[in-house]
Amino acid sequence: MTDTETRLKALMLRGLDGDTAAYREGLALLGVRLRAYFMRRMSGAPGDVEDLVQETLLAVHLKRSTWDSAQSFTAWAHAVARYKLIDHWRRRKIRQTLPLEDHVDFLADDAPDPGVALELDRALASLPQRQRMLVSDVKLTGLSLAEAGARAGISEGAAKVALHRALKALAERMRRADG
């Protein structure tokens, strides 16, 4: 148990027993921790930090009877804070993203089998140039059918048909490679 946990838990227990000064001190200490927590997560909106701190402190006050004193107080308070932050993001329609670099190890496990990648490269190479270019532009690069068609010098409709045929041919070649 950390010093902060020990101190906060003791203050909150005393506060629940009616010690107003201890309760006020506990909320003040928790407020400092909450500010730091929200500042790390709300770097783009520092004005919202104080609102979140106040909302969380109010929720802690209103829901204090749900805290099991046999459990960690800081873990319970952190959960309340996290839910308040998520509610804030939902109200503001904010989608929080995490840097991809944080998940490199996790993603590495899902890396494609090099043998499959080689077979796919071979299958792509066997397609006519226009079809290969359409597959690359639309499926790998992310261009729209209209953009890929313009690059290939054909209409969007023709690009759609050619892409469909190319994907069908690729699927057939990959099935034969597996069989």
Curated annotation (Swiss-Prot):
One of its GO terms (molecular function) is sigma factor activity. GO terms for biological process: DNA-templated transcription initiation. It comes from the Bacteria. The keyword Ubl conjugation does not apply. Residues 145-164 bind DNA. Residues 33-93 are annotated as: Sigma-70 factor domain-2. Induction: Slightly induced by dichromate, partially dependent in itself for expression, does not depend on sigT or sigE. Probably part of the sigF-nrsF operon. Its main location: cytoplasm. Keywords: Cytoplasm, DNA-binding, Sigma factor, Stress response, Transcription, Transcription regulation. Pfam families: Sigma70_r2 (PF04542), Sigma70_r4 (PF04545). It is found in: Cytoplasm. Residues 123-170 are annotated as: Sigma-70 factor domain-4. The keyword RNA-binding does not apply. A motif (Polymerase core binding) lies at residues 51-64. One of its GO terms (cellular component) is cytoplasm. Gene3D superfamilies: 1.10.1740.10, Winged helix-like DNA-binding domain superfamily/Winged helix DNA-binding domain. Belongs to the sigma-70 factor family. ECF subfamily. Sigma factors are initiation factors that promote the attachment of RNA polymerase to specific initiation sites and are then released. Extracytoplasmic function (ECF) sigma factors are held in an inactive form by a cognate anti-sigma factor (NrsF in this case) until they are released. Up-regulates expression of 4 operons (sigF-nrsF, CCNA_02834, CCNA_03001 to CCNA_02999 and CCNA_03363 to CCNA_03366) in response to potassium dichromate (K(2)Cr(2)O(7)) or cadmium chloride (CdCl(2)). Overexpression of sigF leads to higher expression of its regulon. This is ECF RNA polymerase sigma factor SigF.
